[in-house]
């Protein structure tokens, strides 16, 4: 049994398989998930697990060089946005309109659905390299 890092076997496998610039999404419970993208549904009830809880575990186990968020989060969900900025201060940030964000999710290797129920609590993580 694994002791540290991501314990969810599906998430651990996706992270291990990522190549440079591949993307994964951590999403609130309302983001539409394209049929063509692997869905890892962690939502057990409204608010659980939270977006920030899942984000923290993933960023501790993933090399990230860039993140993409919807512009709307900066004004409509400042609390989550400030936490994203703090936790990912080393990454480059890309801001797109929410509709474009949804289009970009079609290229992700997986979308991790949380129980988060606040607006625009979604992020695309772009894999970096560990060397």
From Swiss-Prot:
Catalytic activity: beta-D-ribopyranose = beta-D-ribofuranose
Pathway it works in: Carbohydrate metabolism; D-ribose degradation; D-ribose 5-phosphate from beta-D-ribopyranose: step 1/2
Keywords per UniProt: Carbohydrate metabolism, Cytoplasm, Isomerase
Gene3D superfamilies for this protein: RbsD-like domain (3.40.1650.10)
Binding residues for substrate: 28, 98, 120-122
GO cellular component: cytosol
Keyword Repeat: no
Location(s), subcellular: Cytoplasm
Residues of the active site: 20
Protein purpose: Catalyzes the interconversion of beta-pyran and beta-furan forms of D-ribose.
Family recorded in the similarity comment: Belongs to the RbsD / FucU family. RbsD subfamily.
Name recorded for this polypeptide: D-ribose pyranase
Organism per entry: Bacillus cytotoxicus (strain DSM 22905 / CIP 110041 / 391-98 / NVH 391-98)
């Amino acid at each position: 049994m694994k002791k540290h890092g991501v314990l969810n076997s599906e998430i651990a496998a996706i992270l291990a398989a990522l190549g440079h610039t591949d993307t994964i999404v951590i999403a609130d419970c309302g983001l539409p998930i394209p049929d063509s993208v692997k869905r890892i549904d962690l939502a057990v009830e409204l608010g659980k697990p939270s977006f920030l809880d899942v984000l923290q575990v993933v960023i501790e186990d993933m090399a990230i060089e860039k993140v993409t968020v919807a512009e709307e989060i900066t004004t409509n969900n400042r609390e989550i946005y400030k936490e994203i900025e703090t936790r990912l201060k080393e990454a480059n940030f890309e801001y797109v309109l929410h509709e474009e964000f949804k289009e970009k999710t079609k290229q992700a290797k997986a979308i991790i659905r949380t129980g988060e129920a606040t607006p625009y609590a979604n992020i695309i993580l772009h894999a970096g390299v560990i060397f």
